């Protein structure tokens, strides 16, 4: 087994001469086999091995096993690190919490030692268990390949050089090499799904097909090749199509709608992998199905799907936008417009009611902002009020003809977010005279004989 292990490791670049490599060792047959193999490799390649052990303190034998490893490393002049896991809530999310603790410890050891590689002893049976668990619990295509043989980690790489070997082969290697290893009796219990698969399901599958583990290895490789191919096709187009915004990202709808559902699925999967996954936001298959339904619904120009952590994917006419929504509701505010003065409606919006016969110095910071003007004839009933839109708002567009403000927004294809933030200016009778950026009321149009006393100036920072 050693020569096969050594040859493949050299070909795959699992190590380089004189490297420092951290080997995660639990004391079980798989990790002791890995340590034994790497000790032999180290002699040939002048490697510096560092052993990292986590004492989970879940069994009475844990302390004895840790002591054995400490003595083992001392006798062989191997650098040895050990830590103990203290968990006051032993029964809640035990596996996940222990795993997080282990890898944080391994990361610290790598940083201390300046190691380029962390090696763990995952084997082919582990791969089969992992793939079955993902299928049972539900997974998407990008995660269906199971455990990766290598990936970036901490100051270098995490490599699993035993991933092609069945556990039975490791037992045979242990018998030939006659090294000491420990059996974890908790692995024989069926409390956890992984144990039930290991003890009950895998033996039946191997009985049905003695080559089952080889089939798992082939399946995993084919899945990974397919994922890499799809990624190579999608990545250049992803970089070209996705535009960053202040709140997130957006994609031109036309770019996606001309593609097949299969392309849309993998494009969006890659998009989320690049944007949301690094933020700790995950999507399930139900959400992806809902997203594709909203995307391709020709009857609805707008639609949205809520995701974790207040993230929302929204279709809005020409764009598909991914943004994190604020949890707080919009504050209902009303401002009375004082002639000859201006007010900041927000950090990027300013409104002033300016007399035509008096100079009015604008705040210096808004001079470069985009502006809109509306003349206010003397016949306009004052005072004027500014507020956000309300349900049932109507605006007079022609004599005797009013239109719902909501319909004005729809006709102009105004996104929902812009509708909610739009400002409405009303006269003393609460008639809408202006919706800056969107609509002027017929009531605001001065007659030739009207005298203009004021102008409304609306400034926005784009």
UniProtKB/Swiss-Prot annotation:
Q: Which InterPro entries match?
A: Lysidine-tRNA-synth_C (IPR012796), Rossmann-like_a/b/a_fold (IPR014729), TilS/TtcA_N (IPR011063), tRNA_Ile_lys_synt (IPR012094), tRNA_Ile_lys_synt_N (IPR012795)
Query: What GO terms are given for molecular function?
Result: ATP binding; tRNA(Ile)-lysidine synthase activity
CDD domains of this UniProt entry? TilS_N
Which keywords belong to this entry?
A: ATP-binding, Cytoplasm, Ligase, Nucleotide-binding, tRNA processing
Q: Which residues participate in ATP binding?
A: 26-31
Q: Which Pfam families match?
A: ATP_bind_3 (PF01171), TilS_C (PF11734)
Where on the tree of life does the source sit, at the highest rank? Bacteria
Give the location in the cell.
Answer: Cytoplasm
Q: NCBIfam families recorded for this chain?
A: lysidine_TilS_C (TIGR02433), lysidine_TilS_N (TIGR02432)
Instruction: State the family it belongs to.
Output: Belongs to the tRNA(Ile)-lysidine synthase family.
Q: What is this protein called?
A: tRNA(Ile)-lysidine synthase
Q: Which organism is it from?
A: Enterococcus faecalis (strain ATCC 700802 / V583)
